[in-house]
Amino acid sequence: MTLPPTPIDIPESERTPLVKWLQEIVAGQQLLIEHQQSTIAKLEAKVSELEAKVTGLDEELKAAKKLKGKPQIRPSTLNQEQKQPKSGGKRPGSDKRSKKTDFVVDEELIIEPLDLPEGSRFNGYREYDVQDLILKRHNIRYLLAEYVTTEGRTITGKLPTQQQGHYGVTLRAFVLYQHHQCRVPQPLIVEQLREFGIEISAGQVNRLLMEEKASFHTEQQEVLQAGLETAEYVHTDDTSARHQGHNGYCTVIGNDLFAYFSSSDSKSRENYLRLLRGSHEDYVLNEYARSYLIAQQLPQCHLVKLQFSRASVAQGEAACLAYLQGLDITSLQAVKLLTEAALLGSAIEHGLSPDLIILSDGAKQFAILVHALCWVHMERGIRRLPGNTALQRQEIEAVQEALWDYYRQLRDYQDKPSESEKERLRLRFDEIFGQRYAHHYGLNLAMQQFCAHKDELLRVLDTPQVPLHTNAAEADIREYVTRRKISGGTRHADGRRVRDTFTGLKKTCRKLAYSFWQYLLSRLQGNNRIPYLPDVIRARMNQLRELAHSQ
């Protein structure tokens, strides 16, 4: 506020030295006040600017340190179908499957009526079907006939090949099914079998679950190999899996046809590449390894020491470290990058496609080959924003609405892809996520993240069959999480491997529409009633490709 001019015009004759001195003081004070007002206005503007910056940095710090605790996030609506109301007809869920479908009669019992009047004529039978289950002990005593030849040699009958130990195939399959399919802990299995009249100890149940499972381990490993060889994409995720009282991790790799689980003490990229390499032990520095090292910015002083070819440079981890030491490459970061590159090279040499799309939630260890990102996980970065003002909340809602609409357009594109629609969707992505908002640091940061990962989010435009989310991977890993809540961690290496193997085989059977119970019986009996799962995966993928080409 500017001070008014001097209110009194004092004649020159009355301007004594005192009056002049007072006038000078008043004029000086007026200039000082005007200067202070200007300074205050500048400081207020600066304070407003700094407050906005501090608020943005505070939001970023809270997100980085997770100071808010576990956020209460509502379920995403991105994948919910738009349900159209039905007019008339039956209520939802009222259509029941016929009980006569595939009904197999094991026993027929004829029931005659009581007090039948004399002279009644037989009119046929009225069917009444009952489903029941027989659970009882069935002990078998094999009498192995023994003969002595004329030469004095003894010949004895042989047990059936599927008979291993003193427990039959059905009982062994039942124990495996209860533990892995029904998630029944070992103590309850022991109690259950004893109530059925089976004489068995806790140690014997443990051995039935752990020992002589090499064929299952082999099949599960070949399921992974077949899945990686035939897949155009795989989804992946991991979760905690304690072992021997220490932290550990379980990683799942799969798609619509298979699931593979593997537990380890690390969730690093090196560990993930070991899974992709499978059961092989070699290290290969080929051209794909070279491209990986360049992308990861391996120093040139190390790069010039290497020779790249399709030949193996080492067999086993110790030999690989010795090879690098021989090249005078000893820094931890360089050894780490070269190990990852050699593992990647080995995996590709053994059949892994360099164009394989890996769909994940954004964890860095999965960002290899052709990486695709989950839209649902990216959308959470916007949904978590608090919105400190009404304007900020309005901006967040507008972005979410545009994002959901764009997501639905991507789903429509998956059904009917075209070049024109692909180009339009790329441009539309820039229109939505290229926007920036004044004084909304958190939203701008989220939009920058979308732009930085544009290619990974839009893999679907080049490969429409790739899902837009990792819901399937989370459903796979949830199987392991449920088991962990019931039984806790593992104590023995064999138990850890058995849990991984049978969890993967169970999920694979479910995806291929096979009964896990029939699968267990088939493998333990040694017949081919359930085909070899890796062969089924290859055959199914060939059928899908032929169908796609025919269309």
Functional labels for PLM-detected ranges:
Residues 1-166, 206, 236, 281-338:
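Short, flexible loop/hinge motifs at secondary-structure junctions
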Residues 22, 29, 50, 57, ...:
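Mobile genetic element proteins and their domesticated derivatives, centered on retroelements
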Residues 63, 195-198, 202, 207-360:
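RNase H-like nuclease fold core
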Residues 170-182:
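Short, amphipathic alpha-helical "recognition" segments used to contact nucleic acids or chromatin
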Residues 184, 212-215, 241-244, 267-271, ...:
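Flexible loop/turn segments at secondary-structure boundaries
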Residues 311-334, 350-368, 397-551:
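Acidic/histidine-rich catalytic cores and adjacent linkers
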Residues 372-385:
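Inter-helix linker motif
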